[in-house]
């Protein structure tokens, strides 16, 4: 299934980070904080104010966007203004 965000929105895929306590215990998803890093999957046709493209990794506002699931994969549709930074490695 292909999803194309409309207007000034982006489709992003949250990056999974395994969380461990100092003692080495792996925390379950229910105990983790909401991720704030993601990979850009699709960009709406009216996104102009930020320099991001498909494949970029970004940091976004903690509670921004609408969470959706497509083919058992979690995504977020987010407004371009909620992208805070681009991660460059």
Curated annotation (Swiss-Prot):
GO terms for molecular function: ATP binding; metal ion binding; protein folding chaperone; protein-folding chaperone binding; unfolded protein binding. It comes from the Bacteria. SMART domains: Cpn10 (SM00883). GO terms for cellular component: cytoplasm. InterPro entries: Chaperonin_GroES, Chaperonin_GroES_sf, Chaprnonin_Cpn10_CS, GroES-like_sf. Its main location: cytoplasm. It is found in: Cytoplasm. The keyword Cytoplasm applies. Keywords: Chaperone, Cytoplasm. One of its GO terms (biological process) is chaperone cofactor-dependent protein refolding. Pfam families: Cpn10. HAMAP family: CH10. Belongs to the GroES chaperonin family. Heptamer of 7 subunits arranged in a ring. Interacts with the chaperonin GroEL. Together with the chaperonin GroEL, plays an essential role in assisting protein folding. The GroEL-GroES system forms a nano-cage that allows encapsulation of the non-native substrate proteins and provides a physical environment optimized to promote and accelerate protein folding. GroES binds to the apical surface of the GroEL ring, thereby capping the opening of the GroEL channel. This is Co-chaperonin GroES. It comes from Pseudothermotoga lettingae (strain ATCC BAA-301 / DSM 14385 / NBRC 107922 / TMO).
